[in-house]
């Protein structure tokens, strides 16, 4: 059945005549498709088309499933190459405009990384509290829906999905129709490796070398770059990007202090540095860490404990540090106006010297672009904070994932057509070719490292 949140959204934003004229059905699978020529209808969905795209916006659901299975696919542009490439986000209130924003970010990111792919994205409308079994069933149902677009859209993981979900999609649609699969499928498993986070840390190391040149600009004349042992970091969003970023940072630059992190349940701050090893282990086990760490370590000592905990995650952005890394799925972490509902307004933000955008923040929406320009004028031009844009710095994940398509799967390893959709048969196939898939995974990992 169509997800209730999705059904409410579509009924509210699209004329009834559109359903009659545009709805396509295929054995219970339902498709509402729009191109960038459908300017008026796209505007109803909150999407403003331009010279770049979108190439395709599809609202898709399975009306015959007893589960709520549905969501959106946006192929923004194929100008950079075919197919488009981008992850599948899984959240309860995801909208077509959200997916379009992310797809445009992928267009720019893939182009900036010189990858021969267009930009795309998908979103599954589903609760985050699903059981593992129900989650997998919904992902596999969604895989059947997006099979229609396999020639123009290549999915990977994003917020709410992971490498195991990409295996589920590959079981349904074939090895070459999902990215970031586990190693037993020859995949590059970007979530497990923390590939996106690795790019963020490289992006931090580079500005450290070039930032002294900024002192010729009036807003940076008093810029102070601390010694490495005095370098401090705040990370908004201790998740797939943020948690791995902290881990990789401590491996490459162990002297650097991560002094603040946040997640959905709050934030932790310690000016002497947080125990990243312990927090990363907690994240691997529980996904949310701030409240658990508070209960296990802080509550017994109260205010005497050197680490501060707050249930207001956004207030992390009040703290001071040399570098701030937004890594939460929030477009507007900073804005000038409180009416734009940011994590923090620029007049209240902490004192930082550089922002490395680990999260996807780009939006083609003209109103959001205007808000972004207002923010940058104050943060960069007035406050003297360097901003490293998301599509330039967080491309590590797509670079590694793309190798699964660039380094081709040999024909003899392709899952036979008659096995697709049969988990047991596919797993037997993988087991029978264990060594070859392991070697393929190794080749793709090396290719990503050398790219």
Task: Give the ranges of each region predicted by the language model.
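Rossmann-like adenosine-cofactor binding region
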Residues: 266-269, 274-387
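Glycine-rich phosphate/diphosphate-binding loop of Rossmann-like nucleotide-binding domains
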Residues: 191-320
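Glycine/serine-rich phosphate-binding loop and adjoining beta1-alpha1 elements at the start
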Residues: 70, 90-91, 107-231
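Adenosine-phosphate binding glycine-rich loop
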Residues: 2-9, 348-451
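N-terminal functional module of multi-domain proteins
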Residues: 41-117, 121-124, 141-142
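Short, Gly/Pro- and small/polar-rich lid/capping loops
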Residues: 2-60
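Conserved active-site and cofactor/substrate-binding residues in soluble primary-metabolism enzymes
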Residues: 94-98, 133, 137, 161-164, ...
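General beta-strand structural signal in soluble alpha/beta enzymes
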Residues: 153-157, 178-180, 260-263, 325-326, ...
């Amino acid at each position: 059945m169509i997800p209730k949140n999705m059904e409410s959204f579509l009924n509210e934003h699209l004329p009834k005549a559109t359903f009659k004229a545009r709805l396509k059905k295929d054995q219970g699978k339902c498709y509402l498709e729009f191109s960038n020529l459908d300017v008026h209808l796209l505007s109803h969905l909150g999407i403003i088309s331009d010279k770049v795209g979108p190439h395709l916006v599809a609202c898709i659901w399975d009306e015959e499933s007893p589960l709520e299975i549905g969501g959106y696919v946006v192929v923004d542009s194929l100008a950079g190459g075919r197919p488009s490439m981008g992850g599948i986000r899984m959240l309860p209130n995801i909208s077509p405009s959200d997916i379009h924003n992310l797809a445009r970010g992928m267009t720019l990111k893939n182009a900036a990384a010189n990858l021969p792919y267009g930009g795309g994205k998908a979103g599954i409308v589903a609760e985050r509290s699903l059981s593992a079994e129900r989650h997998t069933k919904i992902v596999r149902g969604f895989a059947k829906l997006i099979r229609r677009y396999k020639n123009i859209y290549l999915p990977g993981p994003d917020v709410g999905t992971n490498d195991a979900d990409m295996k589920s999609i590959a079981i349904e649609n074939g090895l070459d129709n999902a990215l970031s699969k586990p190693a037993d499928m020859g995949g590059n498993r970007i979530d497990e490796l923390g590939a996106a986070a690795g790019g963020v840390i490289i992006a931090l190391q580079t500005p450290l070398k070039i930032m002294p040149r900024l002192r010729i600009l009036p807003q940076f004349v008093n810029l102070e770059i601390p010694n490495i042992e005095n370098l401090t970091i705040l990370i908004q969003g201790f998740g797939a990007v943020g948690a791995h970023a902290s881990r990789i940072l401590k491996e490459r630059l162990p002297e650097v202090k991560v002094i603040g992190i946040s997640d959905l349940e709050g934030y932790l701050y310690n000016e002497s540095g947080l125990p990243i090893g312990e927090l990363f282990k907690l994240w691997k086990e529980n996904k949310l860490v701030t409240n658990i760490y508070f209960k296990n370590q802080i509550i017994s000592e109260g205010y005497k404990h050197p680490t501060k905990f707050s249930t207001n995650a956004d207030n992390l952005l009040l703290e001071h540090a040399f570098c701030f890394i937004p890594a939460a799925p929030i477009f507007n972490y900073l804005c000038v106006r409180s009416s734009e509902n940011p994590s923090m307004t620029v007049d209240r933000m902490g004192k930082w010297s550089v922002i490395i955008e680990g999260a996807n923040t780009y939006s083609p929406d003209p109103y959001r672009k205007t808000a972004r320009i207002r923010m940058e004028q104050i943060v960069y031009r007035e406050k003297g904070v360097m901003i490293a844009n998301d599509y330039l710095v967080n491309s590590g994940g797509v670079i590694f994932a793309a190798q699964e398509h660039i380094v081709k799967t040999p024909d003899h390893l392709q899952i036979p057509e008659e096995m697709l959709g049969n988990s047991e048969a596919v797993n037997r196939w993988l087991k029978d070719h264990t060594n070859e898939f392991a070697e393929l995974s190794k080749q793709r990992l090396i290719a990503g490292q050398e790219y």
